[in-house]
A protein has these predicted regions:
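RNase H-like nuclease fold core
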Residues: 1-45, 56-59, 67, 139-149
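Short, conserved alpha-helix that lines the donor NDP-sugar binding/gating region
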Residues: 47, 51
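RNase H catalytic domain
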Residues: 11-15, 52-136, 140, 144-145
Length: 149
């Protein structure tokens, strides 16, 4: 069975500061790139935005309907948030273990909706370790940061 493979990255210059994100979607040996950015944001918001945009592409592409998705991400924050922490955040009214509001709740809600609608497996990859598509995502991210300075 076919699978959609995704790599994502996000970051910024200064935190907060100008930020960018990059995505590579791979299907049937073809890799498509997507990127974007913001003038004033945080690393975590850009990591989340990358994942949201990647999964939105999958959800809205008829050819990908019903296929499993493997998302490779170098952000432990996003991987742990969507696979572990989010269940308790929702049960506790979007509060953390120490009863503080969850940061980036708006983005977590979007990511959760997409993750729930698709068959997604989340895989952490080490950033800046020479993994080809992760490096491409980083380059896309850096170009967007430069555009938003």
């Amino acid at each position: 069975m076919n699978e959609v493979t995704i790599y994502t990255d996000g970051g910024c210059s200064g935190n907060p500061g100008p930020g960018g994100w990059g995505v590579v979607v791979i299907f049937n040996g073809e890799a498509k790139q997507l990127s974007g950015g913001e003038k004033n944001t945080t690393n975590n918001r850009m990591e989340l935005t990358a994942a949201i945009n990647a999964l939105s592409i999958v959800k809205n592409t008829k050819e990908f309907s019903g296929l499993p998705v493997k998302i490779n991400i170098d952000s432990q924050y996003v991987k742990n948030g969507i696979t572990v922490w989010i269940k308790n955040w929702k049960l506790k009214g979007w509060k953390t273990a120490d009863k503080k509001p969850v940061k980036n709740q708006d983005l977590w809600i979007q990511l959760d909706e997409l993750n729930s609608a698709l068959d997604v497996s989340w895989n952490w990859v080490k950033g800046h370790a020479g993994i080809e598509y992760n490096e491409i995502c980083d380059q896309l991210c850096q170009k967007e940061i430069a555009k938003n300075r």
